[in-house]
Amino acid sequence: MKWNEELDAQSDHPLVPGVIVVLDLDKFKEYVRERGLDPYRPNIVTGELTEAVEELARRYRGVVVYGFSRERGTEEAIIEIPYLEDVNSLVKYLEEVSERIKSYGASISIVVLRDFITGKPARNRREAYYATPARRRAIKLLKEIKRKGGGRILVLT
């Protein structure tokens, strides 16, 4: 049995090579509280991130696995991009997004990981975070970045 066949056996969907992007605003509850913002409505930061995630998915033919919300604003998201070979322009785009988020006084942590992905939306948060080895690894890396203060882009290809 080939390695990716073994991975397929652990997933509801076949796995293909690609890139997973996991992003999360840092200490955002504090940001919202300090500024007296409504946590259930879009604000300048979550609106910016919503637009950025939508543009990323469109530009790179990615699939938003989890987290995109026009109604509340996007605070976190998981995007999978099947068969993406060159991540340089993706990383440059994510650096621009990070700078825009910083311009509002917030910060964001981002993981870009080349691995085997499903390229399918998740039914719930648990599936989004843990359905595949790549998602589990990306979430673990994101938590490590955030524990160390956040505000970074980690790229593993």
PLM regions with names:
Residues 1-157:
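Regulatory and interdomain segments flanking nucleotide-handling catalytic cores
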